[in-house]
Amino acid sequence: MLSPKRTRFRKQHRGRMKGISYRGNYICFGRYALQALEPAWITSRQIEAGRRAMTRYARRGGKIWVRIFPDKPVTVRPTETRMGSGKGSPEYWVSVVKPGRILYEMGGVSETVARAAIEIAACKMPIRTQFVIAG
């Protein structure tokens, strides 16, 4: 699972996902990509599940780039705990994704293989996405 090696602070505010993504919304490395159409928190487990699904489908052919990284800690309180006594402990990591953000890129394979692999990865995502081609 992806997570930062070290962070400046253990806990973060939740924040809010307003507007569209201005960073990371163009294809940089591959030829085909999966682009987010909705805002969401995508967990490191979901990112890994999508990456595995794509690599399994493409087998040895092609190369895959993961364009998002989970750098936001999500804290969870223990069950059956009363309110108060501080914030919960960090449980998992998420990536804040806004509409327009490229999630995965793929290159070195035919369009049919890339489309099928990216569709499988899209099913692992908690948001609506679209398949995009460079150029």
Curated annotation (Swiss-Prot):
NCBIfam families cross-referenced by the UniProt entry: rplP_bact (TIGR01164)
Assembly notes: Part of the 50S ribosomal subunit.
Family stated for the protein in its record: Belongs to the universal ribosomal protein uL16 family.
Gene Ontology cellular component list: chloroplast; mitochondrial large ribosomal subunit
Gene Ontology MF terms in the entry: rRNA binding; structural constituent of ribosome
Domain of life: Eukaryota
Gene3D superfamilies: Ribosomal protein L10e/L16
Biological processes, Gene Ontology terms: mitochondrial translation
Secretion signal, residue range per the UniProt entry: none
Keywords: Chloroplast, Plastid, Ribonucleoprotein, Ribosomal protein
Protein source organism: Drimys granadensis
Stated name of the protein: Large ribosomal subunit protein uL16c
Subcellular location: Plastid, Chloroplast
